[in-house]
Amino acid sequence: MAKYEPKKGDYAGGAVKILDMFENGQLGYPEVTLKLAGEEANARRAGDERTKEAIHAIVKMISDAMKPYRNKGSGFQSQPIPGEVIAQVTSNPEYQQAKAFLASPATQVRNIEREEVLSKGAKKLAQAMAS
């Protein structure tokens, strides 16, 4: 979601910001997974398979950890995530590895550069179509 991306096209950075909010208990469930799924979809659309896979793995971890706590029949109403679930997810080595990948400057720079190239291409196409 553009709202969470430090720079346009930085879907990994947006996911890291959402994960920081998750770790601080600022987002409930399923809100956190829905926001992450948005970043995952944007990464997939942009062709960034590694970022998409890292975000998808985290979404699955959070969803699996929340299974015993889900309110049945509450639809998409957000519910607080228990501290033990946050601790369980954040202590998982796969979570730590995925978040480190997403937070790495190399990942974020690659995403921003790709978005800039795509934006320039779109501008050139629009100019060509206008003339």
Swiss-Prot record:
Sorted keywords for this record are:
Virion
GO CC, sorted alphabetically, is: virion component
Q: Does the keyword DNA-binding apply?
A: no
**Which superkingdom is the protein from?**
Viruses
Please state where this protein is localized.
Virion
Q: Where is the signal peptide?
A: none
Q: Does the keyword Signal apply?
A: no
List the InterPro entries hit by this protein, alphabetically: RIP_P131-like (IPR054511)
Family from the record: Belongs to the viral ORF131/RIP family.
**Name this polypeptide is given:** Structural protein ORF131
What is the protein's species of origin?
Answer: Acidianus two-tailed virus
